[in-house]
Amino acid sequence: MKDTKKYNESRQLPKGGYLHKDRVEPESSAGAPSISSMSENKENNGNKYNGRLLEKILEPANLNLAYKKVKANKGSSGVDGITVEDLLEFLKQNGQRIRQSILKGTYRPSPVQRVEIPKPDGKSRMLVIPTVLDRVIQQVIAQILSPLFEEKFSEHSYGFRPKRSAKQAVLKCREYIQTGYTWTVDIDLAKYFDTVNHDRLIRRLSKTAKDSRVISLVRKYLVSGVMINGVVTETQKGTSQGGNLSPLLANIVLDELDTELERRGLCFVRYADDCNIYVKSRKAADRVMASITRFIEDKLRLKVNKQKSTVDRPWKLKFLGFSFYHKNQKIGIRVHPESIKRFKQRLKWITARSNAASMTHRMLKLKQLITGWVNYYGIADMKKLAQSLDEWLRRRIRMCYWKQWKKIRTRYKNLVKRGIDKSKAWEFANTRKGYWRIAGSPILTRTFTNEDLRKLGLQSIMMRYSLVH
């Protein structure tokens, strides 16, 4: 097992501050072309840099942008213990040496730290945490390579790409269904990020990234290893789910699937490793499922999860948290029941009686959650759902207030304070009804009207939905 000190020593090169204030470039380079302007240059390709792609990656402007993105994303420290807050000072002292090390090909990435993230189905997803330094280096690579591949990627691919989103993917699905493609081949890849074949990935990468030093650096990241309980294990396949390069590498591998589906003239939508193919009959769907499964497993050397992959009507399936419905010969988008269930679970946690947080803090957390959720699912038709969720959530909030008041005398004082007649307030304060029942009774619906709750800071789901739909 390698220790942290050795990792740092292997990465550090001549001293010489490379950073100034909160920049990774010296002030004299502040006017260098930005990476965003490059991404719109249609002439970008691997040959453009004449074998000096690595120098382009390590340009000061690109390094500055990567540093700022990593800093903004925050996140935990990796195996070396360096935090995002420590990063600026670390790069000031070692940035130039690290840059030279990468150019010479002597830089060695650190192993990643593995963590388990619970999934809704009770299982867990393995994510990895690279060191903050390796996040910056992966980010600078991704910022230059992404524009080179963007012009090659399929129009049917929507995941982890600039100016593309899950919303666009779902709208495209509806378009296919509306035009008669009412059978779905839902392909589920088993542990995709853990099973990517390195050799196939490197070959596809090399066709566009015409610099062997860049290819070598990417391969080093693929095989950098995983640290579990202090022991480093080699990685012979897969790409780290959680690394800054992973989304791009995932799209590079699955672009081969996109090309094959386009060659066959199929209607499909892919978002990262979620792929739905649309056809007009059950027979065609079964045939496509069998042939595409063979292609994925034999050609791409990936594994199809046959238990989760299925052929069915689109309104019976879930895609990116959405589903569909048909009414009056029109296809609509709805939030899938599982997505609603998970949302309510998160709302329940914030409004749990056992939660000791203040009501002000709860209101803030609810606003953040509701805003994010509605912004994502706002393309769905969910007016009735939003109204129903609002009623349920208001009742939960009333329950929280009642629980916080606890004692009879406290309840009495607060009821009177909120305008309830003293005799009624005393009667209400002495009730033996349970919390949930009280929350739906006139005792609290009169004490906390909908308008009262709005003034107290409760974000209305329906109001938020009306702004985005």
Q: Model-found features: residue ranges?
A:
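Non-catalytic, polymerase-adjacent accessory regions of viral genome-replication enzymes
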Residues: M1-K92
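Conserved nucleotidyltransferase catalytic core and NTase-mimicking acidic/glycine-rich helix/loop elements
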Residues: L19, R23, G378-K433
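Glycine-rich active-site/cofactor-binding loop and its immediate structural neighborhood
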Residues: D121-P130, D134-Q139
